[in-house]
Amino acid sequence: GDSESEGTWERLFKRLRDRGLRGVELITSDHHHGLVKALRRQFQGAAWQRCQTHLMRNVLGQTPRHLKAEMAAWLRRIFRSESKAEARQAFGELAGELDGKAESALQTLEAGLEDAIAVLALPAKYRRRLRTTNMVERLIEEIRRRERVIRIFPNSASAHRLVGALLQEQHEEWLTGRKYFDMSEYFEWKQARRASSG
C-alpha cells in the first residue's frame, strides 16, 4: 500500500536525518523497492544488507518441494561464508548442482546475492546480528503483543504514547542492559582500514 511507497520512506528518512541521524554505515531491511531506493538516496554511502531470512524464504518458496532441504543447506552455507568470494563460489557450486532443477529459485538467489552478503565486508563478530532484521522484527512483535492487550485505543495519540513508551523502554534496555553488540572493535577496525588505504 501507500505506507510502503518510496515517497513515504523518503519522508521518514528525511525526518530522521533532520532530527540528527548521522553516521549510518549499514542498513538491514527487507527488499521493498521503494524502501531501498529511498535508503540509497537519503543515506548515500551506506551499505545495504538485504535480510537473509527474507531472501531465504523467497528462494525456498520457489524451490521444488523435493529439493527444499538441499536448497536450505546450500543457503546456510552461502550466508555463513567467511568472505564474499567464498559465498560467490558456493553459489556457483549450487547453480551447477541444481542447474535445470530449480531455475526460478536460483534466479531469485542470484538477483539478491550481492545485497544479501554485504555484511561479509564487516568483521565476523558483527555479521550474525546484522545479517537479518530479527532485532527489529522482535521489537515489532512486542509492540503488537502489548497493543493486543489494550485492543481498543480511544484515539491515535494514545496509540502513539504506547509505542513511544515501548520504544523508550527498549532504548533504555539497549543503554543499560546486556549490549546487543559492542561497536568499539568496529570503529578500531574501520580506523585501521582507513589508515592502511590512505
Give the ranges of each region predicted by the language model.
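Active-site beta-loop-alpha junctions of metal-dependent nucleic acid enzymes
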Residues: 1-20
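A generic short alpha-helical patch detector that favors 3-5-residue windows
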Residues: 1-5, 27, 48-51, 63-67, ...
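Alpha-helical elements of the RecA-like P-loop NTPase motor core of helicases
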Residues: 7, 33-37, 107
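A general structural motif
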Residues: 22-24
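Conserved beta-strand -> loop -> alpha-helix junction used to position metal-binding or nucleic-acid-contacting
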Residues: 26-33, 38-76
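Acidic/histidine-rich catalytic cores and adjacent linkers
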Residues: 77-198
